[in-house]
């Protein structure tokens, strides 16, 4: 059985996994796809969904997933250029001859196993790691030469533990300190936080916030300086579904505004939802770099649930399917004239 604790003084909901998933306001992508397609019994696994997906695949014939591309004008500026970059920890190479460019408007998912070099690459981009070979330019400059205001106005990094960036004793003090450090107008960070997390109270100690709230506060602190490049290290670790959905919206808005974004993540569903490009690292080397669909579908390890259900066609998310054939699905579920309507 599954017990759902909805919060807001609402009663518990107890039932079998299928009963709970059919009614739950949030659910894994494979369940959302089953609900959208009207499958019964509702599949709870990719294997069961593939068995039920034949009619849905037929409906998708002749349709193509939405193109994930950046605005040509936004993508003209190179925010990061790495050329044959090598980074070592002692004698051990952490990055080996890495070459890549990140432009404004891109959302790049940096993926790979633990120890592949993802966090090391983010650290090199902000100047925390010296190169043992090759070069890296952030905003056209060697990031290790950037200090203080020059650094925060060029690039922002949200680490795996966002709380590490938060030092004040209240949220309000944190916002004031961020305004001061960024040289921003008074109230800038607080205004950003209201947009990102309107339920956060200014008198709260940052350590008393949830992990999701700490992440959004850290994001507001970094965005106060308006850096064109934003880096996030495992941003969905510990987040619940609603906060993760909010983060996806925020990242899309930032990309549309021209920010370049790189996410180091194991979250294939996040990459499927928001990334325009995926870079895969293995033992410090880039082994794949291309559009999200091309990269994640070619590897079972990185394929999201919807891609596994609808393979070999390049559908990545439930929202992709809905945007293509949503009206057809609604008509197919509509009652006929002979059906009883409740």
List each model region and its residues.
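A short, surface-exposed alpha-helical micro-motif characterized by mixed small hydrophobic
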Residues: 271-273
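Conserved ABC ATPase "signature" C-loop
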Residues: 8-9, 284
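Conserved ABC ATPase "signature" region
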Residues: 184-202
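H-loop/switch region of ABC-family ATPase nucleotide-binding domains
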Residues: 265-266
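Conserved ABC transporter NBD signature motif
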Residues: 134-142, 151
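ABC ATPase nucleotide-binding domains
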Residues: 14-75, 302-342
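Helix-to-loop junction immediately C-terminal to a conserved catalytic motif
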Residues: 126
């Amino acid at each position: 059985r599954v017990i759902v604790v909805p919060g807001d003084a609402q009663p518990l909901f107890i039932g079998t996994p299928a009963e709970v998933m059919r009614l739950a306001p949030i659910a894994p992508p494979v369940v959302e796809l089953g609900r959208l397609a009207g499958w019964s019994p509702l599949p709870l696994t990719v294997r069961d969904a593939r068995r039920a997906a034949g009619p849905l695949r037929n409906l998708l014939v002749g349709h193509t997933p939405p193109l994930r591309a950046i605005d040509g004008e936004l993508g003209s500026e190179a925010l990061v250029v790495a050329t044959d970059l090598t980074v070592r920890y002692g004698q051990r190479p952490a990055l080996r001859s890495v070459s890549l460019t990140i432009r404004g408007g891109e959302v790049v998912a940096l993926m790979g196993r633990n120890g592949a070099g993802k966090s090391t690459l983010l650290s090199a981009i902000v100047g925390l790691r010296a190169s043992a070979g090759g070069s890296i330019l952030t905003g056209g400059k060697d990031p290790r030469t950037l200090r203080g205001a020059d650094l925060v106005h060029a690039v922002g990094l949200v680490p795996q533990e966002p709380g590490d960036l938060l030092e004040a004793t209240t949220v309000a003090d944190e916002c004031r300190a961020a305004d001061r450090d960024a040289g921003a107008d008074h109230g800038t960070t607080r205004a950003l936080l209201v947009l990102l997390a309107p339920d956060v109270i200014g008198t709260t100690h940052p350590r008393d916030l949830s992990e999701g709230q700490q992440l959004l506060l850290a994001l507001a602190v970094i965005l106060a300086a308006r850096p064109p490049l934003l880096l996030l290290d495992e941003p969905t670790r510990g987040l619940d579904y609603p906060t993760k959905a909010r983060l996806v919206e925020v990242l899309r808005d930032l990309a549309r505004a021209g920010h370049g974004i790189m996410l180091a993540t194991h979250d294939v569903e996040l990459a499927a939802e928001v990334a325009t490009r995926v870079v895969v690292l293995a033992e410090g080397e880039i082994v794949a770099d291309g559009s999200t669909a091309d990269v994640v579908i070619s590897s079972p390890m990185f394929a999201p649930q919807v891609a596994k259900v609808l393979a070999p066609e390049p559908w990545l998310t439930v929202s992709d399917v809905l945007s293509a054939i949503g009206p057809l699905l609604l008509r197919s579920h509509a009652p006929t004239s002979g059906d009883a309507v409740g």
